[in-house]
Amino acid sequence: MSALSVIEQRLLKWDKLASLVPKSKKTPFPIDRLNELLKVCANSSYLRIGESIHAHLIVTNQSSRAEDAYQINSLINLYVKCRETVRARKLFDLMPERNVVSWCAMMKGYQNSGFDFEVLKLFKSMFFSGESRPNEFVATVVFKSCSNSGRIEEGKQFHGCFLKYGLISHEFVRNTLVYMYSLCSGNGEAIRVLDDLPYCDLSVFSSALSGYLECGAFKEGLDVLRKTANEDFVWNNLTYLSSLRLFSNLRDLNLALQVHSRMVRFGFNAEVEACGALINMYGKCGKVLYAQRVFDDTHAQNIFLNTTIMDAYFQDKSFEEALNLFSKMDTKEVPPNEYTFAILLNSIAELSLLKQGDLLHGLVLKSGYRNHVMVGNALVNMYAKSGSIEDARKAFSGMTFRDIVTWNTMISGCSHHGLGREALEAFDRMIFTGEIPNRITFIGVLQACSHIGFVEQGLHYFNQLMKKFDVQPDIQHYTCIVGLLSKAGMFKDAEDFMRTAPIEWDVVAWRTLLNACYVRRNYRLGKKVAEYAIEKYPNDSGVYVLLSNIHAKSREWEGVAKVRSLMNNRGVKKEPGVSWIGIRNQTHVFLAEDNQHPEITLIYAKVKEVMSKIKPLGYSPDVAGAFHDVDEEQREDNLSYHSEKLAVAYGLIKTPEKSPLYVTKNVRICDDCHSAIKLISKISKRYIVIRDSNRFHHFLDGQCSCCDYW
């Protein structure tokens, strides 16, 4: 059925309802008929017609007597379902007498509007007034509001209260009770409640499992699932979907395969929702080809399944494949939704493809998802990671609603672009709006302090503000402090901090300190740190490379040879440097000394041209990092054809003069390329942005935004 047909049917229904509303204000209309009309208006959100009926009841004096409670309850139901909670409460407060339906309708109204605290407050008023005895519907609403607001202690008190009234025997009360315990406690309390219940069916176990899944208590969720197996329950569709979701989060492929086999055996694998759960599970378990097979075998293609398979490729870091799937979609038959756009924009962000991101932004605007928070967050992320922090700011400013993810994305984006002060200003604005920072927020803030050398302020955020906002520091926060201190040249403080910190350091922390030693030329400490890190993490290639670079900078060629020999003996492979640039909606990828590109001869000629132009400006090849066992000329050639230089050269050939270039590299940009590209930006009068594994480098007129520290 087309959208136009739906609208036409809705208008016909509206006209029919409107014709039934009494026109005479003096003649009472049959009450039963009016109540039926109010019910239809409430369920269809026809507020204006409902208001007309309310007006008729007032003028015919049918809404102020105690015996008219049924009509008033119908009106309360209308207003709460039309999100007019304040008007519903006015009616409720003016009622001469209230019954349990009145209380329950008002509670549900508050709950549907997200005011769970008001629900619990209203229940307490009902309980202490003694006007009405709670029933199973009231108990369900109360337990649900405890779940929504995380008020487990109050929930336990209400549990005792409803036990006294004998309401726990009702199936849906039991289900919401168990869900509350599993969601809010996150421990074995729900299982203990299950054991204490006189009767449990599959729906109760499903509620417990759903709660544990929501709060991330996957071990307890697995215990519940085992109980369902021990009780010999016949699983239904919900059980299978929940179990797949559980195994997705546990990344337990073996158990997931057993469930998939069982689904096939009992015919539960053909439903669209089940196929989506299977695709999601295989994607999370790193088996994207299995996910593709499930997708290919599904006959009912829709946006839910298309988005799920794209997400599977996104989880697998196969970002280009996710984008290719979208290009094959018939967007007229299967229009993208907010989840589709979020996955696509985040895939583009990981690939740093600004032009493609701009095109997709246009489609977002056409599709009407401009004001959706999830899409807005993805747009900010895409522009920030694609090198245009200015467009990220515009996307951020244009958002009608923002959440913690929005602020975190903006703070992190500014930080990675080296705009530390702007990141800290965004943090201050976030606090001013009342948003509560989380662990991700403080990672961005501490990195920002590190980029601009705000040591004291960074330590204040770490020691004071994180405690104030009840954020427990983890390994990433501690590593940020190591970077903050060592980048400022405070190596003694960094060593003391690492020695006394109450955590076990990982290889990233040691690499952070080692990189600072390399950049700050503290080679003595660098060698000491590298030797310790190699002993503890013998398979991490990054540590070997940094140690080799330290030896090379010191002209200790024997040390370089020793490190490379050690890597060969241990089978440790250096991650190859790869750079890419987007030209006319196509991505061009380059390796060092690449000879695979169809225009490589032209590219090499351009490299030679620009290198000859920058030498008179003071460029001197940094041959320390090149192979020492070849002659000087060969070393210079090796450096000339690094992947980032090839990408920049291709951009200079293929883009209009004075247009900006955006290049991405998978590892840290080398010292020689950094020096060269600074001067290339000067002679070409180009704005060149390079994103490496550490940060963004904005090259303009012979300078870089990183101030030669990265």
Swiss-Prot record:
Listed A to Z, the keywords are:
Acetylation, Repeat
Looking up Pfam families in the UniProt record yields: DYW_deaminase (PF14432), E_motif (PF20431), PPR (PF01535), PPR_2 (PF13041)
**Segments for region (Type E(+) motif):** 585-615
PPR repeat placement: 35-64, 68-98, 99-133, 135-169, 170-200, 201-235, 236-270, 271-301, 302-336, 337-371, 372-402, 403-437, 438-473, 474-504
Keyword set includes Nucleotide-binding: no
- Region Type DYW motif, as annotated, extends over 616-710
Q: Which GO terms describe its biological process?
A: RNA modification
Which Gene3D superfamilies does this UniProt record tie to the protein? Answer: Tetratricopeptide repeat domain
Q: Which domain of life is it from?
A: Eukaryota
| Residue(s) carrying N-acetylserine | 2
Coiled-coil residues are none
Q: Which NCBIfam families match?
A: PPR
Query: Which family does the similarity line name?
Result: Belongs to the PPR family. PCMP-H subfamily.
* Protein name as annotated: Pentatricopeptide repeat-containing protein At5g39680
Query: What organism is listed for this UniProt entry?
Result: Arabidopsis thaliana
Designated gene of the protein? EMB2744
